[in-house]
Amino acid sequence: MSTSSRRRRSPLELSSSRSSSSSSSSYASWASTTSPSTSTSTPPSLSRTTTVSTSHVFLFLLAFRLLNALSLRTFFQPDEFFQSLEPAWQTAFGETHGANGDTICGLPSILCYLLQFILSPTLPRALFVSPPHSAILSAIGDLYTWKLARYVYGRRSHEAWAALALTVLSPWQWFCSTRTLSNCLETTITIVALNLWPWEWSSESTPTVQPRRNTRSTTRDTGLDNTGDGAVVVRLRKCLTLAALACILRPTNILIWMGLAGVAWFRSAWRERTILCREVLLCGVSVLTGSVVLDRLYYGLWTFPPLKFLYFNIAQSLAVYYGRNDWHYYATQGYPLLLTTALPFTLVGLYRTLSQSQSTINTRNVSVQTQLAAICLLMPLVLSLISHKEVRFIYPLLPSLHVLTAPPLVDFFLPAVSRSNGAYMPRRLSLVFLLLVNITVAIYTSVYHASGTLNVLSYLRDQQQAHTTVDKSAYSPGSSQRITAGFLMPCHSTPWRSHLVDPNIHAWALSCEPPVDLTEPQKAVYVDEADQFYNDPSQFLRENMVGGLRHLPRKPSYLASSKSLEASPQAYQQATPHEWPDYLIFFAQLEPTLHSFLRSSSYGECWRTWNTAWHDDSRRRGDIIVWCLDPTEQAAWRSATRKRTLEHRDHQFDRIVETLRKNAPAEILPLDSMDILSVRAIGLLNLVLVLALGTTQTVLVRNPVTSLEEVLMDPSDMDLAKIFQEEN
């Protein structure tokens, strides 16, 4: 059920099936007979590069993705927690510990079984377990993207290195590839399987499968260059096994393999068709049987999660409950988000590939490009028929898109970087600009955008730790105090128990359970708890909180004389009506509303963190604010806020003084200490007037570094006002 635990397993399987030495030589024979892509106009002298060891490339990618995984500080999709880490936490520690996993659709239970041996109740290791394994999976995906490009364009072609550069410098890859999403694992499995697919079957220039001669010698060689019957069957078997795993994980992945299998069926001989059908049945039934058995062991009953996936999203149309998108979403938003600055080159690559003449399509490399382009169009086209769309649904296509993007990228930038001709300067500047844009987008989305949803959970852990280590309460001496938290946010706005970790943190959040098994009339009027709150916050708080808006607690539960909470985290989370918590967490958009309802209560701001500069959901805009009942914490936060404000103002004054020193006439320099004090006094006076009058037009000083006698409010002199505006 946990994506991160599946990630723990897959690298071992993949690395055991193909060692780095065999991988580096797997393309040698085929590449020696294949020229670079005919779709590129790169001169032959520029189409070759030096050979680099595959193991060295993988080590670089592994280090790069490990840095990538450890640098993630932001929230992307609830599924990266509620369909991976949360179910794993529940499996490891039991339902009573408050994990809130999404088990409606279910993922193969082997994921949770693997992860439960990693998690530890003593330390928040769950926060550090997934990055290394996610980095390994992402690095494998990058490596096999490069390998597929080498297969298509030649081992030493610039196009292969361009494909590697595209995947390494992709903002989407940096933002998404190391997350605990099932789509990330699906993408890695898909690109590895594409490397094992018998592309030669759909190319008329490739000899058909020959009768088996020496099974022992050929079955051990799984390289793509070997056309022996035994080697092709072994390679196909591995490919279909991985493809079946990807389809079990995400049933929509079958669209990729239906397209490739259809082309192979129509363009291959009957013997190859027989082999294909036999292996599809063999691998499909084997993987399906294993999945059903594992699910039976985990759930305790016979179930088939992929069927539930289709029933949930297609038959009951419950996917629409989580959002409805335009039919052109994947064309106008999906591809631009996946490709960012590479989108123009991708469009050129797709056009070139699909406009190839019939005579060139039969060649091996062009045939592979054509099939990759076909599946890159087929999958979004079919998924566009479903109302609910997300860019991550087409994420498995990104490696193939990078392979197709490489030739136009090389054609455009290679002459600019390999020649010193000044005529190529605009292209060089364009390359630098695109790199800067990619780096900026990657850093912002992975470090800053939606970072508050993770930071607030760290704050709650710190508060619980503080109450545990400094416990002076007379009501429970020698024991750790339990704190309570309530999240007045849209559902699944933050991770849950996998990040709260401490079972002494009791928390509840607004829910949004889908209307499963309801009739159509019932679905039409169904409103979940989160929507009920945002539709009418006042009524919701009166009817769904203990005591309503009239009887609110005056001090936190850990300072109250009543007995500490005896209920489990799960029971506290599911209790209705909700208890007023020690800590109330919400987005800044809701602050004015709560101020009007709770202004006479003991709640006050005790922490705030930056979350986003913008958000497509208006309910999630602004900072994340924490109100608490503890007056000591409120006073400490006010004191810290004032201190930061004063430090910021002092810094502003220093900048103003420095600016005045630089702009002052030479005959009155250097300034003595009295001049500096005069300027600082003037700056303070100006700031007070700005805050009081709300305008800078009256905050003016003529030649402030001359003497205090000329400190005048002259509306005609705008010098200092302009400086003040520029500095702020």
Curated annotation (Swiss-Prot):
Residues 12-46 have a biased composition (Low complexity). It is an enzyme of class 2 (transferase). Pathway: Glycolipid biosynthesis; glycosylphosphatidylinositol-anchor biosynthesis. Residues 1-46 are annotated as: Disordered. The chain crosses the membrane at residues 52-72, 246-266, 274-294, 330-350, 366-386, 393-413, 429-449. Pfam families: Glyco_transf_22 (PF03901). Mannosyltransferase involved in glycosylphosphatidylinositol-anchor biosynthesis. Transfers the third mannose to Man2-GlcN-acyl-PI during GPI precursor assembly. It comes from Aspergillus oryzae (strain ATCC 42149 / RIB 40). Its main location: endoplasmic reticulum. Its EC number is 2.4.1.-. One of its GO terms (biological process) is GPI anchor biosynthetic process. This is GPI mannosyltransferase 3.
